[in-house]
């Protein structure tokens, strides 16, 4: 007979909370930095795009003449607000001495919001990029002439804003991946 005589085998002692929280704290730090990048880049997207204006003789090109550019600015403003709020909350949790992993409900809310905003920003950036392509190359089917040779400053600023918006998409997508990790790494018993 064994030393336990049919009794349940002893369970391994749980690892220390400090060791368990180290990867989560490291991910929280990465999330904090990614959200800061999203905040800064969203500010730049908005600032550069709203200054995308140019007048040549009697003609003018302005960012708010296009619904795609207006949508990009609006989505960037929403992402800016959300990312700033998440940055503040992440910084608070990181600096807190009694730091705990977020609840499953909170993890779901973060995951869903991160997914929605990442895809919204991707869609707005893609629509703006398509408009910029047409502005640069024209469209023979629609008989639209390219305008970037005339409105070079406008096109350069709009293009810079679009490139920045794709950088924001990358930061948001990585934040979303971290949110997914926080949500789906949990055992099914923790609620």
From Swiss-Prot:
Membrane topology: Multi-pass membrane protein
Cytoplasmic compartment segments: 1-25, 90-114, 179-191
Topological domain spans for side Extracellular: 47-68, 136-157
Predominant cellular place of this UniProt entry's protein: membrane
Coiled-coil region: none
Residues bearing glycans: 137
Domain of life of the source: Eukaryota
InterPro entries: CASP/CASPL, CASP_dom
Key words, A-Z: Cell membrane, Glycoprotein, Membrane, Transmembrane, Transmembrane helix
Compartment(s) where it occurs, according to its Swiss-Prot or TrEMBL record: Cell membrane
A Gene Ontology term for the protein's cellular component: plasma membrane
Membrane-crossing residue ranges in chain numbering: 26-46, 69-89, 115-135, 158-178
Family per record: Belongs to the Casparian strip membrane proteins (CASP) family.
PANTHER family, per the entry: CASP-LIKE PROTEIN 2C1-RELATED, CASP-LIKE PROTEIN 4A4
Description of how the protein assembles with itself and partners: Homodimer and heterodimers.
Protein name per the record: CASP-like protein 2U3
Organism this protein belongs to: Selaginella moellendorffii (Spikemoss)
């Amino acid at each position: 007979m064994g030393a336990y005589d049919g009794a349940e085998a002893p369970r391994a002692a749980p690892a220390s909370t400090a060791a368990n929280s180290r990867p989560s704290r490291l991910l929280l730090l990465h999330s904090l930095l990614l959200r800061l990048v999203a905040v800064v880049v969203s500010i730049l997207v908005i600032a550069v795009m709203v200054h995308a204006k140019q007048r040549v003789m009697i003609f003018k090109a302005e960012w708010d003449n296009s619904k795609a550019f207006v949508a990009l600015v609006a989505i960037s403003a929403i992402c800016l607000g959300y990312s700033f709020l998440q940055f503040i909350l992440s910084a608070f949790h990181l600096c807190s001495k009694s730091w705990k992993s977020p609840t499953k409900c909170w993890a779901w809310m973060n995951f869903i919001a991160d997914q929605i905003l990442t895809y919204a920003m991707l869609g707005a950036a893609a629509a703006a990029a398509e408009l910029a392509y047409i502005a640069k190359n024209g469209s023979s089917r629609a008989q639209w002439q390219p305008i970037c040779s005339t409105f070079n400053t406008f096109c350069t600023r709009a293009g810079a804003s679009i490139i920045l918006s794709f950088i924001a998409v990358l930061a948001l997508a990585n934040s979303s991946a971290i949110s997914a990790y926080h949500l789906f790494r949990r055992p099914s018993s923790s609620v």
